[in-house]
Amino acid sequence: MAIEKATKGQDYLKTLIKEFPSSHAIKNCATSDYDGLVMSFRSSLGELVVDPISANYDARVAGDGPQACDRELANEKIVNPSVSKMNNEMTFLSDVAYLATNYLRK
């Protein structure tokens, strides 16, 4: 679920690049920030059985991308409630994945 939501979120951000071509923040959100989010969720899922400690770490750092996106948007004084909501949801999913994988380590 998290991978699918993150991918859809990244697709949405890519449409915003076309609407705001001069925004470095939106470009970073759509590329590096959400690339990291999707890759971390995928990596965490792939490591669940073989390396639960790494899966736990990747679940935690997945939330870094959406948080960075929020900071970048704030620095450019861009207010977009749908992106803020999406970033909050992605951070929440990262927290849930972290807690779930933390439980598996025990």
Model-derived features: positions:
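Folded extracytoplasmic luminal domains of secretory or organellar precursors
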Residues: M1-K106
